[in-house]
């Protein structure tokens, strides 16, 4: 029996008048535009269709046959990627209609219908694998994010992602993190400053790195510095860093870092973030917990497509 999808609860959102599941947060009002992701989806289709197209479907299915299909969850998780799936089908044939039943950001149970499809049978079969590839991967990212978000519930820590994304998929993976209730760190090297260990080594120290940045970028740019010792933390604070990344520190050292910082900078914990450790890290008092594994190693969610 089909299970009803539910949206992960957030006080700032309510269900629509129609009672359909609604996304997690206001950020979802602006998912990646079709123009932005179309090159990614088109590349995936070209890769799959090759030189001759879908030779199996074209040989078996009459050109004028229409079909009705459903995309359904085969395990519990958080949905993401419908925007890419819809575009995949429409690039194959614009007449394919995808109707979401559990929008991106919805929490679903096994058997929940995520979306319905109507249109030419050939187009649905041809676009199936590419569409599902986006859904299973991005839903996996959203689900992994949601698990960490739930694990730190009741603390002040927020879960954020990193630049450790799969090449070409960053905008979609970061969207999937938001679907799971997480936040995005910088999108690229051009939109935020983060002084990392190799910058510090090359520049001759934390203070020297911050001084060089201030001289070039001015006082209005927020500077974040990666540190792995208390001495580096104190140097970063003295030099005026507004945010500090605590790299691979144990929770007890993080607590000490929080006490020393005393609100002078925001603190981000990073490195070795696991489901088992994340609660203790959050309880240290840090503001953010960043995880590269959310995007580079998330397990795919089991989702299938069936004709009905």
Which stretches of residues belong to each language-model region?
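Active-site loop ensemble at the mouth of alpha/beta enzyme cores that anchors a bound cofactor
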Residues: 304-308
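C-terminal active-site rim and adjoining tail of enzyme catalytic domains
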Residues: 248
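Acidic/glycine-rich phosphate/pyrophosphate-binding loops and surrounding catalytic core
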Residues: 2, 6-11, 20-239, 243, ...
């Amino acid at each position: 029996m089909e299970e009803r999808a539910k949206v992960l609860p957030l006080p700032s959102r309510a269900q629509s008048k129609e009672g359909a599941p609604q996304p997690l947060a206001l950020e979802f009002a602006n998912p990646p535009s079709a123009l932005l992701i179309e090159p990614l989806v088109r590349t995936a289709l070209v890769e799959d269709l090759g030189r001759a197209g879908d030779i199996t479907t074209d040989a078996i299915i009459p050109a004028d046959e229409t079909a009705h299909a459903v995309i359904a969850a085969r395990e519990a998780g958080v949905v993401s990627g419908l925007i890419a799936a819809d575009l995949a089908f429409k690039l194959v044939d614009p007449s394919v209609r995808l109707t979401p039943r559990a929008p991106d950001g919805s929490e679903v149970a096994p058997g929940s219908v995520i979306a319905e499809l109507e249109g030419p049978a050939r187009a649905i079969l041809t676009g199936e694998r590419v569409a599902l590839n986006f859904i299973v991967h991005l839903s996996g990212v959203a689900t992994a994010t949601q698990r960490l978000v739930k694990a730190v519930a009741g603390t002040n820590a927020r879960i954020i992602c990193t630049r450790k994304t799969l090449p070409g998929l960053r905008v979609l993976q970061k969207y999937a993190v938001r679907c799971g209730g997480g936040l995005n760190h910088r999108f690229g090297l051009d939109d935020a400053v983060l002084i990392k260990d190799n910058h510090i080594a090359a520049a001759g120290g934390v203070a020297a790195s911050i001084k060089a940045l201030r001289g070039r970028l001015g006082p209005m740019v927020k500077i974040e510095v990666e540190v792995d010792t208390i001495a580096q933390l104190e140097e970063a604070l003295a030099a005026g860093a507004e945010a500090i990344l605590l790299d691979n520190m144990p929770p007890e050292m993080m607590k000490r870092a929080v006490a020393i910082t005393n609100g002078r900078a925001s603190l981000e914990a990073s490195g070795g973030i696991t489901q088992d450790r994340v609660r203790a890290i959050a309880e240290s008092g840090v503001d953010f917990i960043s995880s590269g594994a959310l995007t580079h190693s998330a397990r795919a969610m089991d989702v299938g497509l069936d004709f009905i």
